[in-house]
Curated annotation (Swiss-Prot):
Catalytic activity: L-seryl-[protein] + ATP = O-phospho-L-seryl-[protein] + ADP + H(+); L-threonyl-[protein] + ATP = O-phospho-L-threonyl-[protein] + ADP + H(+)
Zinc finger (Phorbol-ester/DAG-type): 1260-1315
Gene: Rock2
Every PH domain range: 1150-1349
Source lineage: Eukaryota, Metazoa, Chordata, Craniata, Vertebrata
Domain of life: Eukaryota
Organism listed in the record: Mus musculus (Mouse)
Coiled-coil features, chain-numbered ranges: 439-1131
Sites bearing Phosphotyrosine, chain numbering: 722
Domain Protein kinase positions: 92-354
The protein's name in its UniProt record: Rho-associated protein kinase 2
GO annotations of cellular component type: centrosome; cytoplasm; glutamatergic synapse; neuromuscular junction; nucleus; plasma membrane; postsynaptic density; presynaptic active zone
Regulation affecting activity: Activated by RHOA binding.
Domain RhoBD: 979-1047
Length: 1388
C-alpha cells in the first residue's frame, strides 16, 4: 500500500524568515500606501491621527478612564515633540490681513527661513464644526494640491493646530477682478482676454472631473504678470460618469447662480458643467456694462429675475457692445439645453467674439496681459482692500465632559508639496547583504555617470550659447541694414514730397498775389461806387428840396429809382465778388501756412533722419568690427570646441563601452542567479522525491521481510504436522521465492536510482561551485570595471584640468601672438579700413552723383517756375490794362448813376423811418426787460426779507419763551406779531394756490391745444392716406392704360403724346402735393414738440411750486403748534404750572418728527453707500432736504404724502443682503404709493415690477420660492428658516414679505396668515432709510407706524409724478427696484 505525500515540511529543512516571500510584498505595498501623498493613511495622516487623538483625549474628565490615561502617559510627550518639529504658524511673519470671511481670514506672510512671500488662509475649526459643515475645505485642498495647472492657485503646504487649519498658497499680488473692474472701465478688448482665460481655467477644472459652481470675479485672481487664476474651490463637486451632478441645495452667489441650480432647491437638482458657463456669461456682461444682468436689492428680486431671464435680460442703450459680445452673452445666459459649452469647450473657442490678432488659445498665457500690476516690492498689497482688525474674541471648543472628537474631521489635512519624510529610505529592503552592496555600488556608478552627463551638457550649453550669440549678432546686422535701407527710402520720399510742396507753395503764392490784386481793385471800385452813391444821394436831396412844390418830377424820380436799383444790384454783385475774393484769399493764405508748416515738419524730419542715418552708419561700422572679432573668437572657439568634442566623444565611447560591459555583467549575473535558483529548486525537489521514494521502498521491504519470517516460522512448526501437504504446497513456495527475487531486483533498481540521484547531486554541486566561481570572477570583473570607471573619471578630471590649463596657455599664447603680431593685424585692419573707406567713398560718390542729378532736376524745375512766373507777370500786365479799361467804363456808369439821386433819396428816407421804428421797438423791449429784472430782484429781496423776518421772529420767539415768566405783555405783543405773520403766510399760501390754479388752467389749455394739434395731425394723416390711395389708384390706372392692348388702326401718335403730357402733369401735381404735405408735417411736428416742451416746463414749475407749498405748510403747522404751546404756556403760567409740559417723553412734539436719516446710493454691485438727508415728518407730509440751508430756503429734495403710506418696518439681512451687517439693526423701510411722491427727477429709470407668471398665489400672497443662507426664522412656526450650506426650501411674499417654510404650503397647513397688503404692487414703491442708532430706528418706526392710514387710499390716476430735474441729485440714488418689496412690520 502507498501513503499520500506529507503536507508539512521535513524536520531537517530550514524555516523561512517572516519578512521573506509574500510577507515582504505586503510590507512593500503598505510602505507604498504610507508614502503616497494621495493615500488616506500617508505619513502626515498618521501623525495627524495621533495628534488629534491626544488633543481630543487630553481633558480632566476623560483622564479618569484608566485606558485613556495610560495612552496619554505613553504618547503625550512624543506628540508634543512631533508638534514642535512640524510646521507651525510661528514659522511665518504676518505682513498684512488681505481678506476675511465667515470661517477665517487670509494673511500675507513671509516665511522666516526662506524669506519667500505666500498667502496663508486660516480656517477656524470651531466655526466649521458649529455650522455643521467641515467638509468643504477638502475639495479646495485637493484641487490646489494636485491640480498642477497654471490656471489654478497652487498650494505649497497645509498644516493645523488645535484651533485653525492653515493653507499656504501662492500670493497673487494683482488682486481680484472686482478690484480691476472698480479701478478701470473695462473695454471689450480686455473683456475678451479675461473671458478667454476664465474659459481655459474652467476647462482645466472640468477636465479634472469637477464643477466649480461659484464662478465670480471675487474668485478670479491676477498674478504679478496680470494673468488670471481661479481660487476658492469650496463649492466644487465631483461629476458622475455622465458628467452630471446630483444636488438638492442651491450653491453659489445670488447674482451669478444659474436657473437649473436655483431649481435644485426643490429636490430635483440634476445639472452639469453648463452651470459654470452661465456664470461666465454674467461675468462678461458685468465687465462690459459695469453691473450684473439680474441685479436686485433683495434675494427674492434677484432670483425671480434669473428664473425669468428670457424677459429680464436686456442690454443698456448707453453702453456700446458689439454684436458678437451680445451673441456670446445671450448664448451663455439661456436654458441649459441650448447653452453654449454644453457639448464641450471647443464650441466656445470657435465663437467669433474671441477672434483677434494678438493671441490664440495656445499662447494666451505667454502674451502680455492688458493690465500688468505695478508692484513696489514682493509684499505690495495695494490691489487688495484694507481690512479692519478683528477685535472680537476668538471662540474655541468648550471643555467636554465626554469624548466629542472635535479634531477627528481634520485628520489627514496636513500636506507638503516637497515632502522630506521617508524620502531617503529605499523602496524595498532585501535581507541579502550582497544585493545591498551591489545596489550601493550601482548607485555610485550612476551618480558618476550623472556627473559626467551634466559636465557634457554644460559643455554643449556653452557651445549653444556661443552659436546663439553669433546668430543674434547676425540678426542685429541684418536689422540695421534693413533699417538703413528704409531710412534711405524714407529720405527720398520726403525729399520728393518737399519738392512737390515747394511747387504748390509757389503756385499758391502766385494765386494769392492775384487774388490780393483783384480784391484791392474791387475794393477801390466799391469805394468809388459808394462815393458816387453818396453824391447821388446828395443830389437827390437837393432835387427833393427844389421839386417839393412840383408834381411833374415824379417820372424823373421813378427813373432815378430804377437807376438806383440797378446801381444797388451792381453794388451787391461787386460786394459778393469782393467777399468771394476775400474768402479765396483767406483760404489760399491758410493753405500757404499749412504748406509752410508741412515744409518745416518735413525739414525737421529730414534732419532727424540724417542724424539717425549717421548713428546707424556708426553702429553699422561698430557692429562690423564686433562681428569680425566675434568671427575670430568663433573660429578660435570652434577649434577649441572641436578639440573638446573629440575628447568628449572619446570619453563618451569609453562611457558607452563601460556601460555596455556593465550591462553585460549585470545580464550574466542575472542569468547566473536565475540558473542558481532553478538548480537549487531542482535539487530540493529531487531530494524530497528521492527521500520520499526511499522511505516508501524501505517500508515495503521491511513489511515483506517480516511477512517472510512469519511464514518461515509457521512452515517450520507445521512441517511435522503437515508433511503430507508439503508436496501440494511446493508450488506456493516457489511462487514465494519468485516474489522474493522480484523484491530483491526492485531493491537493486532503487539502489541504482539512489546512486544516479547522488551522482546528479554531485554534478549539481560542481555546477554550483562553478557558478560561484564565475560569480566571483564577474564580481572581480565588476571591480575592475569600477576601477576603469574611476580611472576614466580621473582621466576626465585630468582632461578638464588640462583643458583649463590649455585654455590658460591659449589665452597667454593669444596675448603673446596679439602683442607679437600687432603690426600685422594693424596693417590688415588698416587695409580693411582702407577698403571700407574706398567702398564708402564709392557709395558717397554715387550718392553725390544722384544728388547732383536731383539738383539738376531741381534747377530745371526752378527754371520752369521762373518761366511760369514771367508768363504770369505778362498775364498780370494784360489784366491790369483790362482792369483800367473796365474802370473807365465804370466811371461812365457812375456819371449816369448821378442822375438817379431822387429815387435813392426816397429809399433812404423809407429806410430811416424803418430804422427808427426798429429802434423804438428795441428800446421798449429793453425797458420791459429792465422792468422785469427789477421786479424779479424786488421779489427776491422781498423773499429774503421775509425769510430774515421769519428767522428774527423765531429768535424772538425763543427769547420770549425763556422770558415768559417776566413779562406777559411782551408775550401778547409777540402773539400779535405771530398772528399777523400767520395771516401773511396764509395770504402767501392763497397766492401760491392761485398761481397753482393758474398753472393748472394753463396746463389744461396746453392739453386742449395738444388735443387740437393731435386732431389736426389725424386730419393730415387722413389726407395723406387719401393722397396715397389716390396715388395708388392713379398708378394702377396708368399701369392699366400702359398694359391695355389697343388695335393699331385706332391708335395714333397724337393720343399717345396727349396721354404722356397728362401723365407728366399728374406727376408734377403729385410732387407738389407731397412737398406741401411734408412741409405741413414738419410744421405741425415742430408745434407739437414745442407744446410738449411747454407742458414739461409747466409741470416742472407746478411740482416745484407744490413742493415749496408743502414745505410752507409744514412751517405754518410748526408755527401754529408753537402758538398753541404759547397759549397753553400763558394759561399754565396764570395757573402756576411749570414750563415744557406740552412735549411728550421722546423729546419731539407729537405732531412733528425731524432729524438726520441716510438714503441708499448704489456705488457698486457689492455694497450699499449712504447719503445723509434732513427729514421732517409733519401731520400730512414727509419732507426730505439735502441740507439745513435747503430747509431754511423751503427747497425739499423729495416729499412723500403720509396718506399714501402703506407700511413701515425694520429690515432683516435677507432684505438687504448687500448692506453691511453692522448697519442692518439701524435700517428700516417705508412702502408708499407711487403717486404719493414728489421728487427731483433721478438720473436713471425705475425698473418696472415683473409679471405674476412665476408666483404662487395663496391667501392674497404672491409667494416666490427661495433659500436663505443668512439667519432668518419662519414667521408661521418661528423655527429657523436658514442654513449656511443646506437651507430648507422657503417661500417669501413679494407683497408683504412674510417668510415661511415651503412645507406649510405643500401640506396645506392653516398656519400662514392672509396677506396684509391690499395695494396694487405695480403702483407701489419702497424706500430704505438708515438711522444713526438702533434706538432712533425704533423711534422712527414706532412714530411712522402710528401715522399710517388704516385703509390705504386708491391710487389717483391724475396724481403727480416728479419729472423735475436738478443738478443737486445724487447719482445712483437707490429709490429703484420696485420688485424688492419688504415684509410688514412684525408686531412688537
Amino acid at each position: 500500500m502507498s501513503r499520500p505525500p506529507p503536507t508539512g515540511k521535513m524536520p531537517g529543512a530550514p524555516e523561512a524568515a517572516p519578512g521573506d516571500g509574500a510577507g515582504a510584498g505586503r510590507q512593500r505595498k503598505l510602505e507604498a500606501l504610507i508614502r503616497d501623498p494621495r493615500s488616506p493613511i500617508n505619513v502626515e495622516s498618521l501623525l495627524d491621527g495621533l495628534n488629534s487623538l491626544v488633543l481630543d483625549l487630553d481633558f480632566p474628565a476623560l483622564r479618569k478612564n484608566k485606558n485613556i490615561d495610560n495612552f496619554l502617559n505613553r504618547y503625550e510627550k512624543i506628540v508634543k515633540k512631533i508638534r514642535g518639529l512640524q510646521m507651525k504658524a510661528e514659522d511665518y511673519d504676518v505682513v498684512k490681513v488681505i481678506g476675511r470671511g465667515a470661517f477665517g481670514e487670509v494673511q500675507l506672510v513671509r516665511h522666516k527661513a526662506s524669506q519667500k512671500v505666500y498667502a496663508m488662509k486660516l480656517l477656524s475649526k470651531f466655526e466649521m464644526i458649529k455650522r455643521s459643515d467641515s467638509a468643504f475645505f477638502w475639495e479646495e485642498r485637493d484641487i490646489m494640491a494636485f491640480a498642477n495647472s497654471p490656471w489654478v492657485v497652487q498650494l505649497f503646504c497645509a498644516f493645523q493646530d488645535d484651533r485653525y487649519l492653515y493653507m499656504v498658497m501662492e500670493y497673487m499680488p494683482g488682486g481680484d477682478l472686482v478690484n480691476l473692474m472698480s479701478n478701470y472701465d473695462v473695454p471689450e478688448k480686455w473683456a475678451k482676454f479675461y473671458t478667454a482665460e476664465v474659459v481655459l481655467a474652467l476647462d482645466a477644472i472640468h477636465s479634472m472631473g469637477l464643477i466649480h459652481r461659484d464662478v465670480k470675479p471675487d474668485n478670479m485672481l491676477l498674478d504679478k504678470h496680470g494673468h488670471l487664476k481661479l481660487a476658492d474651490f469650496g463649492t466644487c463637486m465631483k461629476m458622475d460618469e455622465t458628467g452630471m451632478v446630483h444636488c438638492d441645495t442651491a450653491v453659489g452667489t445670488p447674482d451669478y447662480i444659474s436657473p437649473e441650480v436655483l431649481k435644485s432647491q426643490g429636490g430635483d437638482g440634476y445639472y452639469g458643467r453648463e452651470c459654470d458657463w452661465w456664470s461666465v456669461g454674467v461675468f462678461l456682461f458685468e465687465m462690459l456694462v459695469g453691473d450684473t444682468p439680474f441685479y436686485a436689492d433683495s434675494l427674492v428680486g434677484t432670483y425671480s429675475k434669473i428664473m425669468d431671464h428670457k424677459n429680464s435680460l436686456c442690454f443698456p442703450e448707453d453702453t456700446e457692445i458689439s454684436k458678437h459680445a451680445k451673441n456670446l452673452i445671450c448664448a451663455f445666459l439661456t436654458d441649459r439645453e441650448v447653452r453654449l459649452g454644453r457639448n464641450g469647450v471647443e464650441e466656445i473657442k470657435q465663437h467669433p467674439f474671441f477672434k483677434n490678432d494678438q493671441w490664440n488659445w495656445d499662447n494666451i498665457r505667454e502674451t502680455a496681459a492688458p493690465v500688468v500690476p505695478e508692484l513696489s516690492s514682493d509684499i505690495d498689497s495695494s490691489n487688495f482692500d484694507d481690512i479692519e482688525d478683528d477685535k472680537g474674541d476668538v471662540e474655541t471648543f468648550p471643555i467636554p465632559k465626554a469624548f466629542v472628537g472635535n479634531q477627528l474631521p481634520f485628520i489627514g489635512f496636513t500636506y507638503f508639496r516637497e515632502n522630506l519624510l521617508l524620502s531617503d529610505s529605499p523602496p524595498c529592503r532585501e535581507n541579502d547583504a550582497i544585493q545591498t552592496r551591489k545596489s550601493e555600488e550601482s548607485q555610485e556608478i550612476q551618480k558618476k555617470l550623472y556627473a559626467l552627463e551634466e559636465h557634457l551638457s554644460s559643455e554643449v550649453q556653452a557651445k549653444e550659447e556661443l552659436e546663439q550669440k553669433c546668430k543674434s549678432i547676425n540678426t542685429r546686422l541684418e536689422k540695421t541694414a534693413k533699417e538703413l535701407e528704409e531710412e534711405i527710402t524714407l529720405r527720398k520720399s520726403v525729399e520728393s514730397t518737399l519738392r512737390q510742396l515747394e511747387r504748390e507753395k509757389a503756385l499758391l503764392q502766385h494765386k494769392n498775389a492775384e487774388y490780393q490784386r483783384k480784391a484791392d481793385h474791387e475794393a477801390d471800385k466799391k469805394r468809388n461806387l459808394e462815393n458816387d452813391v453818396n453824391s447821388l444821394k446828395d443830389q437827390l436831396e437837393d432835387l427833393k428840396k427844389r421839386n417839393q412844390s412840383s408834381q411833374i418830377s415824379t417820372e424823373k424820380v421813378n427813373q432815378l429809382q430804377k437807376q438806383l436799383d440797378e446801381a444797388n444790384a451792381l453794388l451787391r454783385t461787386e460786394s459778393d465778388t469782393a467777399a468771394r475774393l476775400r474768402k479765396t484769399q483767406a483760404e489760399s493764405s491758410k493753405q500757404i501756412q499749412q504748406l509752410e508748416s508741412n515744409n518745416r515738419d518735413l525739414q525737421d524730419k529730414n534732419c532727424l533722419l540724417e542724424t539717425a542715418k549717421l548713428k546707424l552708419e556708426k553702429e553699422f561700422i561698430n557692429l562690423q568690427s564686433a562681428l569680425e572679432s566675434e568671427r575670430r573668437d568663433r573660429t578660435h572657439g570652434s577649434e577649441i570646441i572641436n578639440d573638446l568634442q573629440g575628447r568628449i566623444s572619446g570619453l563618451e565611447e569609453d562611457l558607452k563601452t563601460g556601460k555596455a560591459l556593465l550591462a553585460k555583467v549585470e545580464l550574466e549575473k542575472r542569468q547566473l542567479q536565475e540558473k542558481l535558483t532553478d538548480l537549487e529548486k531542482e535539487k530540493s525537489n529531487m531530494e524530497i522525491d528521492m527521500t520520499y521514494q526511499l522511505k516508501v521502498i524501505q517500508q515495503s521491504l521491511e513489511q515483506e521481510e517480516a511477512e517472510h519470517k512469519t511464514t518461515k516460522a509457521r512452515l517450520a512448526d507445521k512441517n511435522k504436522i503437515y508433511e503430507s501437504i508439503e508436496e501440494a504446497k511446493s508450488e506456493a513456495m516457489k511462487e514465494m521465492e519468485k516474489k522474493l527475487l522480484e523484491e530483491r531486483s526492485l531493491k537493486q533498481k532503487v539502489e541504482n536510482l539512489l546512486l544516479e540521484a547522488e551522482k546528479r547531486c554531485s554534478i549539481l554541486d560542481c555546477d554550483l561551485k562553478q557558478s560561484q566561481q564565475k560569480l566571483n570572477e564577474l564580481l572581480k570583473q565588476k571591480d575592475v570595471l569600477n576601477e576603469d570607471v574611476r580611472n576614466l573619471t580621473l582621466k576626465i578630471e585630468q582632461e578638464t584640468q588640462k583643458r583649463c590649463l590649455m585654455q590658460n596657455d591659449l589665452k597667454m599664447q593669444t596675448q603673446q601672438v596679439n602683442t607679437l603680431k600687432m603690426s600685422e593685424k594693424q596693417i590688415k585692419q588698416e587695409n580693411n579700413h582702407l577698403m571700407e573707406m574706398k567702398m564708402n567713398l564709392e557709395k558717397q560718390n554715387t550718392e553725390l552723383r544722384k544728388e547732383r542729378q536731383d539738383a539738376d532736376g531741381q534747377m530745371k524745375e526752378l527754371q520752369d517756375q521762373l518761366e511760369a512766373e514771367q508768363y504770369f507777370s505778362t498775364l498780370y500786365k494784360t489784366q491790369v490794362r483790362e482792369l483800367k479799361e473796365e474802370n473807365e467804363e465804370k466811371t461812365k456808369l457812375c456819371k449816369e448813376l448821378q442822375q438817379k439821386k431822387q429815387d435813392l433819396q426816397d429809399e433812404r428816407d423809407s429806410l430811416a423811418a424803418q430804422l427808427e421804428i426798429t429802434l423804438t421797438k428795441a428800446d421798449s423791449e429793453q425797458l420791459a426787460r429792465s422792468i422785469a429784472e427789477e421786479q424779479y430782484s424786488d421779489l427776491e429781496k422781498e423773499k429774503i426779507m421775509k425769510e430774515l423776518e421769519i428767522k428774527e421772529m423765531m429768535a424772538r420767539h425763543k427769547q420770549e419763551l425763556t422770558e415768559k415768566d417776566t413779562t406777559i405783555a411782551s408775550l401778547e405783543e409777540t402773539n400779535r406779531t405771530l398772528t399777523s405773520d400767520v395771516a401773511n403766510l396764509a395770504n402767501e399760501k392763497e397766492e401760491l394756490n392761485n398761481k397753482l390754479k393758474d398753472s393748472q388752467e394753463q396746463l389744461s389749455k396746453l392739453k386742449d391745444e395738444e388735443m387740437s394739434a393731435a386732431a389736426i395731425k389725424a386730419q393730415f394723416e387722413k389726407q395723406l392716406l387719401n393722397e396715397r390711395t389716390l396715388k395708388t389708384q392713379a398708378v394702377n390706372k396708368l399701369a392699366e392704360i400702359m398694359n391695355r392692348k389697343e388695335p393699331v388702326k385706332r391708335g395714333s401718335d397724337t393720343d399717345v403724346r396727349r396721354k404722356e403730357k397728362e401723365n407728366r402733369k399728374l406727376h408734377m401735381e403729385l410732387k407738389s402735393e407731397r412737398e406741401k404735405l411734408t412741409q405741413q408735417m414738419i410744421k405741425y411736428q415742430k408745434e407739437l414738440n414745442e407744446m410738449q416742451a411747454q407742458i414739461a416746463e409747466e409741470s416742472q414749475i407746478r411740482i416745484e411750486l407744490q413742493m415749496t407749498l408743502d414745505s410752507k405748510d409744514s412751517d405754518i403747522e410748526q408755527l401754529r403748534s408753537q402758538l398753541q404751546a404759547l397759549h397753553i404756556g400763558m394759561d399754565s403760567s396764570s395757573i402756576g404750572s411749570g414750563p415744557g409740559d406740552a412735549e411728550p417723553d421722546d423729546g419731539f412734539p407729537e405732531s412733528r418728527l425731524e432729524g438726520w436719516l441716510s438714503l441708499p446710493v448704489r456705488n457698486n454691485t457689492k455694497k450699499f453707500g449712504w447719503v445723509k438727508k434732513y427729514v421732517i415728518v409733519s401731520s400730512k407730509k414727509i419732507l426730505f432736504y439735502d441740507s439745513e440751508q435747503d430747509k431754511e430756503q423751503s427747497n425739499p429734495y423729495m416729499v412723500l404724502d403720509i396718506d399714501k403710506l402703506f407700511h413701515v418696518r425694520p429690515v432683516t439681512q435677507t432684505d438687504v443682503y448687500r448692506a453691511d451687517a453692522k448697519e442692518i439693526p439701524r435700517i428700516f423701510q417705508i412702502l408708499y404709493a407711487n403717486e404719493g411722491e414728489s421728487k427731483k427727477e433721478p438720473e436713471f429709470p425705475v425698473e418696472p415690477v415683473g409679471e405674476k407668471s412665476n408666483y404662487i398665489c395663496h391667501k392674497g400672497h404672491e409667494f416666490i420660492p427661495t433659500l436663505y443662507h443668512f439667519p432668518t426664522n419662519c414667521e408661521a412656526c418661528m423655527k429657523p428658516l436658514w442654513h449656511m450650506f443646506k437651507p430648507p426650501p422657503a417661500l417669501e411674499c413679494r407683497r408683504c414679505h412674510i417668510k415661511c417654510h415651503k412645507d406649510h404650503m405643500d401640506k396645506k397647513e392653516e398656519i400662514i396668515a392672509p396677506c396684509k397688503v391690499y395695494y396694487d404692487i405695480s403702483s407701489a414703491k419702497n424706500l430704505l432709510l438708515l438711522a444713526n442708532s438702533t434706538e432712533e430706528q425704533q423711534k422712527w418706526v414706532s412714530r411712522l407706524v402710528k401715522k399710517i392710514p388704516k385703509k390705504p387710499p386708491a391710487p389717483d390716476p391724475f396724481a403727480r409724478s416728479s419729472p423735475r430735474t436738478s443738478m443737486k441729485i445724487q447719482q445712483n440714488q437707490s429709490i429703484r427696484r420696485p420688485s424688492r418689496q419688504l415684509a410688514p412690520n412684525k408686531p412688537s
